[in-house]
Amino acid sequence: MHVVYPGSFDPLTNGHLDVIQRASRLFEKVTVAVLENPSKRGQYLFSAEERLAIIREATAHLANVEAATFSGLLVDFVRRVGAQAIVKGLRAVSDYEYELQMAHLNRQLYPGLETLFILAATRYSFVSSTMVKEIARYGGDVSKLVPPATLRALKAKLGQ
């Protein structure tokens, strides 16, 4: 089965990478879909191309993982790449409530499309891209929260 794992990934965290690695063991092919939201231009720390490069570097050891950018409806991207399902990581109940609504909406737009949830590993359940950016902006150590590719990109971007 071919699945899509969508997100902003601004930046990629160890939590994201854990979901990608686990999905790669469960599914034949995983496409990491990097959202490029035109209405949020200027709000991202990293451009879509930079996020894509970070993901590709961090997942280079996973032969069945690819990454691509998309804008517009996720269901259109899923159709375009020929995937059968969406994979989402869940950290907390609040994630579940939001993702459940999105799963129902996506299924309404694309009947038969499945959304599969992977629970975050406990050690990453508190990690978010927003928190990583905030800590990094203030010079805090995020090395245990992000893969080496992200750490290098953060240091370069923030001049550290």
Swiss-Prot record:
Q: Which residues bind substrate?
A: 8, 40, 74, 88, 134
* Protein family per UniProt: Belongs to the bacterial CoaD family.
Instruction: Write down what this protein is called.
Output: Phosphopantetheine adenylyltransferase
A Gene Ontology CC term for this entry? cytoplasm
The encoding gene? coaD
Q: Which reaction does it catalyse?
A: (R)-4'-phosphopantetheine + ATP + H(+) = 3'-dephospho-CoA + diphosphate
Listed cofactors: Mg(2+)
Binding sites annotated in the UniProt record for ATP: 8-9, 16, 89-91, 99, 124-130
